[in-house]
Amino acid sequence: MDSLTFTPGRAFLSSNSLAPPWTAVFEDEGPAGYFYACDRSQETQEHSIMDAMLIYNRTSLADPAQERLASIQWSRDGQQCVLYLDGSAQAFIDFAAHLSFCRTNFPNYIQEQGDTWRKHSHAWDDAALQHFEADLYA
């Protein structure tokens, strides 16, 4: 598990899967925190981002000055990962199934022809998270 202690407004945590080419990135550049599903085999950084999810808007946090802990936990096969903030799951990426979801269910896009990643919904899925966590500790 890769972790970072940070104060909202400036954070960067990148975590590589043991199963290349997958990478998960948590980033907060000021107004908001995002979680990215990335494919390192792509030629440009722009093309490497498979999906992006809003984790929080800084102004909506109860105490934006409070120090927090971000952690990225990978599944044993390296095909899935979860972003935890202060121990609470906030986002899930399944690289094999090409889907992601988060607590904010944002952003959602109209699915376009040729899209290989599900982007029309980021709705939270408790069952998938429970399965992920059960497999970790089995």
Can you say where each PLM-predicted feature lies in the sequence?
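Beta-strand C-termini and the immediately following turn/loop, strongest in propeller blades
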Residues: 25-29, 38-40, 84-87
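Surface-exposed loop/turn elements that mediate protein-protein interactions on large endomembrane-trafficking
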Residues: 1-4, 34-63, 91-115, 125-138
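Short linear interaction motifs
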Residues: 60-76
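Amphipathic, alpha-helical segments enriched in basic
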Residues: 10-12, 49, 56, 68
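Blade-terminus and WD-like Trp-Asp/Gly-His loop motifs, strongest in beta-propeller folds
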Residues: 3-20, 26-30, 72-78, 117-138
